[in-house]
């Protein structure tokens, strides 16, 4: 069996059912554009660490197979290597290989999250501007719940339990070509502030017959990621916050939750991280900073500051 044949089997048997749709699509891109052109026709039994090493070095220096392409960055190389290693690990479990030649190589750990965490004043400016532009419900939810962009636009109205103030997020639902696609049933549930629930109720009242949480008014279909980025860019331009990316809303939610006293394991569940170790790695600088503050200042002051941080999002909701 060639590597190409096994990768196709691995994608359909394992990856499609274990990964989010966007992750599956990203994996498919890496296989198609980087791994298969060089290694696809090699039998698994003949794949050695020398062959894998030459492949990785070639990709690092010369990039993909298009003429004139430049070398690949460290993050892309790490992703290629990790994906190949993951696939070959499964080949061993399937009894098709005795060892994994990709494990002969190591890449440095990825850098910690480089986040722009909004200050309380910036959050007020951002949300005030979102309200003026008519975008408040979507972006208030993004900021207070830490949702990914793809999760946000794929929400359905019945994901919200108004009575319990909970939102169930489907981790295997996505918007593709302006249609909702379901790939599985994996979910996580988070609790929302009552003010956010009230905003969502008002948003749904605009289109009470739509199953969508957020429906584009002109097309009556889900928003595309490009549309959400356009709306976000409109907000930050008018608010004078050009340095704030959409993903910084999620980071801000995470950091404020830590300052609130939320445990890392609980935050990992809220953000949809598969392992708490990912959360600890991403937000280690903030965890260390908080630990140092607790050690360096009187306990009373620490509790007072934590209480102030705990009230930030609540105060923002009381316009």
Question: Which residues does each PLM region occupy?
Answer:
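N-terminal core-binding DNA-recognition domain of tyrosine site-specific recombinases/integrases
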Residues: 3-4, 11-96, 112, 221-227, ...
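Basic, Lys/Arg- and aromatic-enriched nucleic-acid-binding interface segment
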Residues: 70-74, 78-80, 93, 97-155, ...
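C-terminal catalytic core of tyrosine-transesterase DNA break-rejoin enzymes
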Residues: 93, 136, 140, 144-151, ...
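Short, polar N-cap/turn motifs at the start of nucleic acid-interacting alpha helices
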Residues: 159-166, 262-282, 314
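C-terminal secondary-structure termini that scaffold catalytic or DNA-interacting sites
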Residues: 164, 175-198, 202, 218, ...
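Catalytic-site neighborhood detector that most strongly recognizes the C-terminal catalytic loop/helix
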Residues: 173, 271-297
